[in-house]
């Protein structure tokens, strides 16, 4: 039943190694969940703002609903902070994480080295992920992002590679051990399709258009591999709306990143004149679904798939990522960053609305790391880049970006990030949490161990 629509079990064992194979192929009837009653949660929605630290949230709140207002993500009752650090190959702390190690921490419950995707810090071995564990216990699974579906944050759920750059079959230079010739399972895109989540929505069509170079799909594109595995491949809002839950769905809405919502002048040395953001990006094709739309579509598809699958009491695990908060902060583009943070917040609202109508849904909102943004006095003269914005409530807000020299990419920061939750086991996010602890919260909520 768990493999009802043609999974490829021969791949799974090879991907994950023998130890995990024992774990994930244990018959459902023998799980702790079934011995001890239903899991606390039927479904988990994990929403990740990439690079969305407190400064990024506060800037978006100030600009839109005002300093005294509340975003959707501000309304969750239980909240705390998560550490964000990575480790080196010897396990020593590295105080600033990248998104690959950051996502690996909650996806696997283990910290790893920067750049690595759900493989161990020392031996570079695959580590089982939340999505794999949920899938193999009969939950529907999904991942939604505004980056490439093969980018680091979604990849941490569906793939195991030495380096996050190994997105498609043509991108394997940094991952010799993951090539099929090297005994591995191929690129992130190939592994993601083989992992067979029920719903995959985002950008990255370019990575899926690459030709597989080895293995059973040699000579075909990863998109063709997906179709062969039963995926409906959709490219825009209309096709997404027409997708049916009978088969899994792969949505590829852009060649790489899904185009951002807002635009405006970048931060500059010496600052900018007070300005407003342009809330319509002319570079965004009309048929491109926004993150909240994709989230609602994923929730509907996963709800239907969980229902059809008929595993009693088991709903789904869904991760939703607002990816370009980070991307725009790297570019010191305050309007792009604010628009993406607010688009992410609308996805949070969609998740909360779903949870309202579907009891026993745990909603968790957090980030992978802090970013460069600083909210400065309006008359400050920072050494780095800055921009001054006029907020919706008429305030003047100066945002500074000073973690790199002008012309260079802004850096992540090592601060703890907010985590907030509503639903079963939400209280577990209170206080200061280790960045790996979300793995335990989700596995406990869904009864995965
Ligand atoms: Mg990301
Ligand atoms: Zn980043």
From Swiss-Prot:
Main localization of the protein described in the UniProt heading: secreted
Residues of the active site: 99
Subcellular localization, as worded in the UniProt entry: Secreted
EC number: 3.1.3.39
CDD domains to which the protein is assigned, alphabetical: ALP (cd16012)
Residue numbers binding Zn(2+) 1: 326, 330, 412
Chain sites annotated for binding Zn(2+) 2: 50, 368-369
Cofactor(s) of this protein: Mg(2+); Zn(2+)
Region described as Disordered: spans on this chain: 268-290
Keyword Phosphoprotein: yes
Sequence positions that bind Mg(2+): 50, 151, 153, 321
GO MF, any single term: alkaline phosphatase activity
GO biological process, one term: streptomycin biosynthetic process
Catalytic activity entry: streptomycin 6-phosphate + H2O = streptomycin + phosphate
Pathway assignment: Antibiotic biosynthesis; streptomycin biosynthesis
Pfam families noted in UniProt: Alk_phosphatase
Similarity-based family: Belongs to the alkaline phosphatase family.
Task of the protein: Specifically cleaves both streptomycin-6-phosphate and, more slowly, streptomycin-3''-phosphate during the biosynthesis of streptomycin.
Protein name: Streptomycin-6-phosphate phosphatase
Species of provenance: Streptomyces griseus
Organism ancestry: Bacteria, Bacillati, Actinomycetota, Actinomycetes, Kitasatosporales
UniProt gene name: strK
């Amino acid at each position: 039943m768990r493999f009802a629509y043609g999974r490829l079990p021969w791949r799974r064992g090879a991907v994950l190694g023998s130890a995990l194979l024992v774990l994930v192929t244990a018959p459902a009837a023998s799980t702790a969940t079934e011995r001890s009653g239903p899991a606390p949660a039927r479904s988990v929605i994990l929403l990740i703002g990439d690079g969305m630290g407190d400064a990024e949230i506060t800037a978006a709140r100030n600009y839109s609903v005002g300093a005294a207002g509340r975003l959707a993500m501000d309304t969750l009752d239980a909240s705390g902070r998560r550490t964000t650090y990575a480790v080196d190959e010897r396990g020593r702390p590295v105080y600033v994480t990248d998104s690959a190690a950051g996502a690996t921490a909650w996806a696997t419950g283990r910290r790893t080295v920067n750049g690595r995707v759900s493989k161990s810090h020392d031996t570079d071995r695959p580590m089982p992920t939340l999505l794999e564990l949920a899938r193999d216990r009969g939950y529907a699974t999904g991942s939604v992002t505004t980056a490439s579906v093969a980018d680091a944050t979604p990849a941490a759920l569906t793939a195991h590679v030495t380096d996050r750059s190994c997105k498609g079959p043509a991108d394997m230079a940094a991952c010799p051990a993951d090539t099929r010739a090297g005994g591995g399972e191929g690129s992130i895109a190939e592994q993601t399709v083989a992992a067979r989540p029920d719903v995959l929505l985002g950008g990255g069509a370019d990575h899926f258009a690459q030709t597989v170079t080895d293995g059973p799909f040699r000579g075909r594109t990863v998109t063709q591999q997906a179709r062969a595995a039963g995926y409906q491949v959709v490219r825009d809002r209309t096709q997404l709306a027409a997708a049916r839950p009978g088969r899994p769905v792969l949505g590829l809405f852009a060649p790489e990143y899904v185009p951002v919502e807002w635009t405006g002048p970048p931060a500059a040395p010496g600052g900018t004149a007070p300005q407003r953001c342009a809330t319509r990006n002319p570079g965004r094709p009309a048929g491109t679904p926004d993150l909240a739309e994709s989230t609602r579509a994923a929730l509907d598809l996963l709800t239907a798939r969980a229902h059809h699958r008929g595993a009693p009491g088991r709903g789904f695990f869904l991760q939703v990522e607002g990816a370009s908060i980070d991307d725009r902060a790297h570019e010191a583009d305050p309007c792009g960053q604010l628009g993406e943070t607010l688009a992410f917040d609308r996805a949070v609202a969609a998740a909360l609305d779903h949870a309202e109508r579907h009891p026993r849904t745990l909603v968790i909102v957090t980030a992978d790391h802090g970013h460069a943004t600083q909210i400065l006095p309006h008359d400050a003269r920072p050494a780095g880049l800055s921009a001054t914005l006029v907020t919706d409530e008429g305030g003047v807000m100066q945002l500074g970006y000073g973690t790199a020299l002008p012309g260079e990419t802004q850096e992540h920061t090592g601060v703890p990030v907010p985590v907030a939750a509503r639903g079963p086991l939400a209280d577990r996010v209170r206080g200061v949490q280790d960045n790996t602890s979300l793995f335990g919260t989700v596995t406990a909520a869904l009864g995965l161990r």
